[in-house]
Amino acid sequence: MRNDIVKIVDRIIQGGRLSEAEGRSILQAGGASLGWVMAGAQQLRETYCGDGVGLCMIVNAKSGHCSEDCRFCAQSSHYHTGAPVFPLKTAEQIVAEAQCADSRGARCFGIVTSGARVLPGAELESILAALREIRETTRIAPSASLGLLDEETARALADAGCVTYHHNLETARSYFPHICTTHDYDQDLETVRVAKAAGMKVCCGGLFGLGETPEQRLELGLTLRELDIDSVPINFLNPVAGTPLADATPLEPMEALKIIALYRYLMPDRHITVCGGRGVTLGDFQSWIFQAGASGMMVGDYLTTAGRQLSDDLRMVTDAGLTYERC
């Protein structure tokens, strides 16, 4: 495996691409072979991203009562989870949280709302006002995760200063009907294209541990590569009581690290950020995400679950011999 990995890494650095067959071999790696896979992923991260780790924080700006039936989600109105339910926060509240994120070293701050899409009118106008104020009063790059997107809304977000639009595909097309039935995969793909056409960067990735096969993890990665995504968030399922996936078994740490490595090989020059489920899935192996190829991580709290202390995450970065970036 060592010689194969050396050849693959050299070819990628010279402008080549990981093939589907090579992707399958990475997903089959274990033991010492996985060590070589991770070493190659680390070399690619160092080559394309250096030693800087991007820190991302989010605000749950509107929670619960979502009409979508995503089988993993605490905020779906189809399930009884006890997750917080509240309307859109005011622009002032969102800006205050962005300023706090700025002071704590975040390079990106995401405004995240529940629901299939942002409501036109007062709801959208409040978000646009928050984006404009964040651009004027902080050093961070604001992003938005507001669900499905049309061209008019995308242009308004871009004009207000939204740097990045976040919209996960969640899983491979072939597995998506097992996870969500209230909208079509093509709607997600169109949202990505609309955001890019409006001039925003796109942050788009997936959630792993939903019951998908290794082949479907590769399928999703190939889709993201073809979409020319700017940054890739990798999430791992943190099972939520009350959802259909409440009893799902979290991925083993080495399996999760293998996914991170695969995506670094597939998209060597893109930011790969490890987000939700990091603690539950990786446990004592959280610092290994950088050896597996990750160049960023979400810090602070997630949408409906608590994250680690920021000081612990920053220490993890510096203990790995890396630095954390500002915008």
UniProtKB/Swiss-Prot annotation:
SUPFAM superfamilies the UniProt entry points to: Radical SAM enzymes (SSF102114)
GO BP terms in the entry: biotin biosynthetic process
Keywords tagged on the record: 2Fe-2S, 4Fe-4S, Biotin biosynthesis, Iron, Iron-sulfur, Metal-binding, S-adenosyl-L-methionine, Transferase
UniProt-annotated binding residues for [2Fe-2S] cluster: 143, 203
Enzyme nomenclature, EC number: 2.8.1.6
Positions contributing to [4Fe-4S] cluster binding: 66, 70, 73
Family matches, as PROSITE patterns: RADICAL_SAM (PS51918)
Record CDD domains: Radical_SAM
Cofactor note: Binds 1 [4Fe-4S] cluster. The cluster is coordinated with 3 cysteines and an exchangeable S-adenosyl-L-methionine. Binds 1 [2Fe-2S] cluster. The cluster is coordinated with 3 cysteines and 1 arginine.
InterPro entries registered for this protein in UniProt: Aldolase_TIM, BATS_dom, Biotin_synth/BioAB, Biotin_synthase, Elp3/MiaA/NifB-like_rSAM, rSAM
Gene Ontology MF term list: 2 iron, 2 sulfur cluster binding; 4 iron, 4 sulfur cluster binding; biotin synthase activity; iron ion binding
Annotated metabolic or biological route of this protein: Cofactor biosynthesis; biotin biosynthesis; biotin from 7,8-diaminononanoate: step 2/2
The reaction(s) this protein catalyses: (4R,5S)-dethiobiotin + (sulfur carrier)-SH + 2 reduced [2Fe-2S]-[ferredoxin] + 2 S-adenosyl-L-methionine = (sulfur carrier)-H + biotin + 2 5'-deoxyadenosine + 2 L-methionine + 2 oxidized [2Fe-2S]-[ferredoxin]
Superkingdom of the source species: Bacteria
Transmembrane intervals: none
Pfam families: BATS, Radical_SAM
Residue span, Radical SAM core domain: 48-278
Cofactors (names): [4Fe-4S] cluster; [2Fe-2S] cluster
Alphabetical list of PANTHER family matching this protein: BIOTIN SYNTHASE, BIOTIN SYNTHASE, MITOCHONDRIAL
NCBIfam families linked: bioB (TIGR00433)
Its biological purpose: Catalyzes the conversion of dethiobiotin (DTB) to biotin by the insertion of a sulfur atom into dethiobiotin via a radical-based mechanism.
Family: Belongs to the radical SAM superfamily. Biotin synthase family.
Complexes and interactors: Homodimer.
Protein name: Biotin synthase
High-level lineage: Bacteria, Pseudomonadati, Thermodesulfobacteriota, Desulfuromonadia, Desulfuromonadales
